[in-house]
Amino acid sequence: MLRHNIVMLMEDLINGRCGWCGTDRLYVEYHDREWGKPTADDKTLFEFLVLESAQAGLSWLTILRKREGYRRAFRDFDAGAVARMTEEEVGQLMRFDGIVRNRMKIESAVSNARHFLSVQREFGSFRSYVLSFFPDGKPIVNRFRSLSEIPVSNPVSDAMSRDMKKRGFRFFGPTICYSFLQATGFIDDHLTGCICRRK
């Protein structure tokens, strides 16, 4: 979600929050209630897998504004139901304006659901799979003071995205992977001065 070329133009903190969320009500609510909060539920992890993949090349706010459309289109983020979607259903989604109508991204959500289920079977949960990339098996809490310090990827996201690519996942490179890890609380990048900073 955070990109250096955009971040360089932002204030570090706005109203006591990480400056990337600005003052947009939806963005602020997302920042305060979700971003960086530890996620243990695989259904929520699948939701963010779909949403972060859809965001590739777009703004995160665009995807947040279409989130309910994605929820409807992708069976309330039930990975099993999405994995069973047919080519005909993919075609129907190309006519649904509640999501970004990009055939490759829609098809990747379906194939990624199948790979997600495979990972669950192998590791017991997708969360366990994600944590397998962390040296001590625990989330990372960074202590950045400025948005410009936050990287677009790190060794964990590099290794995880590389492994996911080998497993067949699409639209999930190192930068998208890092955003996913931030969003789901595996990496806490709330700035040290942010009111949502994990204590």
Language-model regions: role of each:
Residues L2-K199:
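HhH-family (HhH-GPD) DNA N-glycosylase catalytic core used in base-excision repair
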